[in-house]
Amino acid sequence: DTNGEPSAIRRIVIEKPFGYDLQSARELNEIYRKSFHEHQLYRIDHFLGKETVQDIMALRFANGIFEPLWNRNYIERVEITAVENMGIESRGGFYDQTGALRDMVQNHLAQLVALTAMEPPVQFNADLFRNEVVKVYQSFRPMTPEEIRRRVVRGQYTESEWKGEHQRAYREEDKIASDSRTETFVAMKLYIDNWRWQGVPFYIRTGKMMPTKVTEIVIHFKPTPHRVFATADGSTVPNQLVIRIQPNEGI
């Protein structure tokens, strides 16, 4: 009985996958709460442990240069990418029941969207931070079935040649059904309906067996009203802020 030892420090850290859907996640919560207090439970996303991800808060809220520009008046769009140049390797049994949407979008990419879009907490503590993250999720514009068809793309990698080596198709991987429709790629266009981000599209994408391995956030700023440095065809190189999370951390 962990709750019967007030002098002991007992914590439980829970990583993904935390259930298969909303109902199973709620059932797991009830199981844990029978033996632990809420303050002893840590449901973590290991992406938040990456140094560059943690630095997003300082970049935004301790920076007098970027924060005044961090809104719909100056930002045209936001792109968040997390792709890998390898397949599922030996994780077939897990991955075919999960897919890219559950494996990456609803946790890792959702956290990156929240860190990019959230309002500054009044103080830097876990509860206030979480409250601002929740506000972002509550502001996601719901999608109708028709909008899902237009704004969401799901894909699955096929056989290919990569650096002179043959790469198997997803359906040829170990423990994968030959008719599997599990996605290994997801891209979607999101909108956050609040004062700061109204009308600014957030593009997120993730996938296996892509041409490169990279996780990054790209902030695309709006062009200047008068293009002094336009090229002969009238175009200009857009201003971007790139936050590279991996493989080479940097801004």
Regions found by a protein language model. Name each.
Residues 1-251:
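Secretory/organelle targeting and membrane-embedding segments
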